[in-house]
Structures are given as C-alpha cells and as structure tokens.
Amino acid sequence: MKKYIAIALLAGAFFTSCGEYNRVLKSTDYEYKYEAAKSYFGKGQYTKASTILEELITILKGTEDAQESLYMLAMSYYNQGDYITASHYFTSYYNTYPNG
C-alpha cells in the first residue's frame, strides 16, 4: 500500500511541475515569464529556462532586465553543453554590453 501511495505522489508532483511549465509558456505576462525563467535557471533546469528566455530576449531588449536575460540564456546553453549556441549568445552579450 505504501508503495502505491509513493508512486501516486511522485506522479502527482511530476504532472504538477509539467502543468506549471506549460502555464508559463502559454502566459502573456512577460514579467511572470521572466521570473519563472530565473527560477528555472536557479534550479538548474536550463532547458526550460532557455526556452522561455529565447522568447523574452527580444521583448526585454532596452529594459533593465535585458542584460541579465541575455547572460542567463548564454549560460543556459553553456550548461546544456550546446557550446556553439552559447558562444553566439556570449558574443551577442559582449557586443551589446562591453562593460559587463
């Protein structure tokens, strides 16, 4: 019986986290998406963070969050092992924000 309860709890946690991510993707609230991307990045969920940040970098351009979002996007790809894409975004970051 305990085994079934444990499996049910794990399944529930899995589907809840998937539901939250889908809710973020469908949202039109860009501040909410940005906060979610930062949260995913902080938790080491770089694929989720990069998916959200890809959408946000053009929207956030010219805002105070643009620099951090571009850096997190580059680091997300780097941490996923996608060094070519990471290099592209690091170069973009350097060209846009030469003083860091």
Question: What do these predicted regions represent?
Answer:
Residues 14-17:
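C-terminal motif of bacterial Sec signal peptides marking the signal peptidase cleavage site
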Residues 19-22:
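Bacterial signal peptide processing site
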Residues 24-26, 58-66, 94-100:
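Short solvent-exposed coil/turn linkers within tandem alpha-helical repeat scaffolds
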